[in-house]
């Protein structure tokens, strides 16, 4: 095995950092996650595995709050996510204590991306095997925001995006169907996008919503998700029926 394949700080002859690419592969194998930014709403939707009957499903949440006005979802290694989330939460608290102001969504995104980048060039560590979607409202302007970070430390702002398993298919769906909307329509779009790759319907979907009016993260209950999924399926059936046109009389 070549030296540049073992060490995270050594480039290969063609300019690759293989450990970073391996971390990106861990992301591609992770459960799908979708983020959508509306005019007054931000939504995170994540594919989740079925939990055993005896497991407390609350302990397997994939969408978490970093601060009152910021939430994060990720695809990749759960243990890596726990470490990164704890560091980000401490930074949010430290910022409040030091400056007496909450962080902006961009600030904490830069912090998380900086941590991820640092772990690509430091000895004795490896890159974080996860990609994050970060949503929230700026505490000063109340403008909604959606950012993505990846294991290399790159971050970017989006209107809608996906990461994890089948993210390319979900992204294509979002590109075709995204319209800047508000409220429930934003939630529906996120769930519709995830249903493109989740075959078992609403029971394997986790959804969290934050609105400008309430300003805090709300995790949707399974019953609420089922209602929205039923609405989406009814709309899809009506659209297909309209395409076929009225039945011909014999």
Curated annotation (Swiss-Prot):
Gene3D superfamilies: Glutamine Phosphoribosylpyrophosphate, subunit 1, domain 1. Its main location: cytoplasm. PROSITE patterns: PROTEASOME_ALPHA_1 (PS00388), PROTEASOME_ALPHA_2 (PS51475). Expressed in roots, leaves and flowers. Keywords: Cytoplasm, Isopeptide bond, Nucleus, Proteasome, Ubl conjugation. It comes from the Eukaryota. It is found in: Cytoplasm; Nucleus. InterPro entries: Ntn_hydrolases_N, Proteasome_alpha, Proteasome_alpha-type, Proteasome_asu_N, Proteasome_sua/b. There is a cross-link at residue 62 (Glycyl lysine isopeptide (Lys-Gly) (interchain with G-Cter in ubiquitin)). The keyword Ubl conjugation applies. Disulfide bonds: none annotated. SUPFAM superfamilies: N-terminal nucleophile aminohydrolases (Ntn hydrolases) (SSF56235). Induction: During cell proliferation. It holds the Pfam family Proteasome. One of its GO terms (cellular component) is nucleus. Coiled coil: none annotated. One of its GO terms (biological process) is ubiquitin-dependent protein catabolic process. Component of the 20S core complex of the 26S proteasome. The 26S proteasome is composed of a core protease (CP), known as the 20S proteasome, capped at one or both ends by the 19S regulatory particle (RP/PA700). The 20S proteasome core is composed of 28 subunits that are arranged in four stacked rings, resulting in a barrel-shaped structure. The two end rings are each formed by seven alpha subunits, and the two central rings are each formed by seven beta subunits. The catalytic chamber with the active sites is on the inside of the barrel. Belongs to the peptidase T1A family. The proteasome is a multicatalytic proteinase complex which is characterized by its ability to cleave peptides with Arg, Phe, Tyr, Leu, and Glu adjacent to the leaving group at neutral or slightly basic pH. The proteasome has an ATP-dependent proteolytic activity. Mediates the association of the SCF(TIR1) E3 ubiquitin ligase complex with the proteasome. This is Proteasome subunit alpha type-7-A. The lineage of its organism: Eukaryota, Viridiplantae, Streptophyta, Embryophyta, Tracheophyta.
